[in-house]
């Protein structure tokens, strides 16, 4: 295949949108305004099924997303104070826990946690604001492909396999500044909050932390698991997250 000559981010964006349109039966002939290109690129990535694509596309996509990550601003752990430094907390392990509000896809740490769904393929809703969509969009289409390969192996044993609530799956991070993505499926609150749902959420945190140890992940950033689309009450979820992390540190 002839090598594509790309000079800058603008040309990369043109190429990626064009190739993603070609790759889509439904949208192969759409006309894209210059101002809408980045939104269209993300949307086409979101709806794309996990199928093979050219090495040249991946090369251009990877360079584009890595440069975009730099432009967004990469945040290292050294620049995030612990709760002891920030709030003067005197609780146990206050020097090992931080609270940070921001874009998790900017973090240059060992692992970030993704609030996934039971199909494990990311969010297919174009431009959706959920964490699953944000992480997959910034990582690149390779992440969905790896998740698909994981699910394909599981479904060799069980055709109807869905990732269970409270488990954790570790994948590469691809074009994110972190090293790994830890995917966990949180509980869904349909009506009242029950002890089982609380325990399910606790298991999400424990599974992620245990997986981190197994993979040599020494720094981990949790998003707010289940508090968005899955309707877990914010305050209750925060208490579970904090108490579970603290208990884990006591035994490790």
Predicted regions and their residues:
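Macrodomain-like recognition of ADP-ribose-binding/processing modules
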Residues: 1-252
């Amino acid at each position: 295949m002839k090598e594509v000559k790309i000079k800058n981010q603008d040309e990369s964006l043109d190429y990626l949108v064009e190739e993603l349109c070609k790759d889509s039966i439904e949208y192969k002939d759409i006309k894209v305004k210059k101002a809408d290109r980045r939104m269209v690129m993300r949307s086409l990535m979101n709806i794309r099924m996990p199928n093979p694509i050219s090495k040249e596309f991946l090369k251009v996509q990877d360079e584009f997303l890595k440069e975009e990550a730099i432009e967004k601003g990469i945040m290292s752990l050294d620049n995030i104070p612990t709760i002891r430094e920030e709030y003067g907390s005197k609780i146990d392990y206050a020097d090992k826990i931080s609270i940070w509000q921001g874009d998790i896809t900017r973090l240059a740490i060992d692992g970030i946690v993704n609030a996934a769904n039971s199909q494990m393929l990311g969010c297919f809703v174009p431009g959706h604001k959920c964490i699953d969509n944000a992480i997959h969009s910034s990582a690149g289409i390779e992440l969905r492909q790896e998740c698909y390969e994981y699910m394909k192996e599981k479904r060799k044993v069980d055709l109807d396999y869905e990732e269970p609530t409270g488990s954790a799956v570790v994948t590469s991070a691809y074009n994110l500044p972190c090293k790994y993505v830890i995917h966990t499926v949180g509980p869904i609150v349909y009506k009242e909050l029950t002890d089982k749902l609380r325990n399910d959420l606790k298991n999400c945190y424990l599974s992620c932390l245990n997986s981190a140890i197994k993979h040599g992940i020494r720094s981990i950033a949790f998003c707010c698991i289940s508090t968005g689309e899955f309707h877990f009450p914010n305050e209750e979820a925060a208490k579970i997250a904090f108490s579970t992390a603290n208990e884990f540190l006591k035994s490790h």
